[in-house]
Amino acid sequence: MSGAPIGLFDSGVGGLSIWRQVVHALPSEPLLYVADQAHVPYGHRSAAEIQAHSQAIADYLVAEGCKAIVVACNTASAVALEPLRQRFPQLPILGLEPAVKPAVQLTRSGVVGVMATPATFQGQLYRATVGRYATAVQVVEQVCVGLAELVEQGELEGPDCDARLMGYLEPMLAAGADTIVLGCTHYPFVIESIRRLVGPSMAVVDPAPAVARHLADVLAREGLLAPAERGPLEPASRYRFATTASPSDFNRALSRLVGVSSSSQALIWQQRPDQSPVLHPA
């Protein structure tokens, strides 16, 4: 089991911001990444739909022999993490908790901005995190409609991207925020543009490195780390990717965002007799 892959999934390419940190933290681990680009973004979808698709993707990852799963999507973590843990109690399943706690520790003004999707803000996980760690600060919630789509399209910089970002940033700046939480895995791909627009005095919190460290700790505790004598794996044997949309489009995004050249597998959505979704290779 220790040599089995780690599964990661997101609605699209955003989870690659988590994937690249796992690559650095765990160089001997094989990884299987699934992008549900047929339904990207998850942020405006219903909780029932997000849960159903997350469950089907997890079923696929388990069938592929994954020893652990990372829900590399803030929206899916907010809505589907606990149902997935109940469905697979034998499997370590990690999600993304909004990085409110470190932001509260960093702020000097007492005002923290959070950039996320509507579904993340409405989720119990986010509300519980804010209630636990942020009662002594003001939290400014900024819904970033369309930002995940910009990242999916590869629009990571330029005047149009800057104008869109400033539309999200200005309400937080006006409220006095000096710390901003990136509450969607797509957003780290525009972190340099955000930092340039807000200036060096603003702290921008990307939770991805902490997620990778936590995954390493969990695997070590459960005895699931790949054998140390294996050493770092070659990319061709280490990385597997699958998408529910166009493999060629995903491959281009993969090269653009994380500098990896690979051929992804196409997956298709079908329905079981009870109308629940299921994933199959195309």
Where are these regions (language model features)?
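Non-catalytic structural scaffold of enzyme domains
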Residues: 1-282
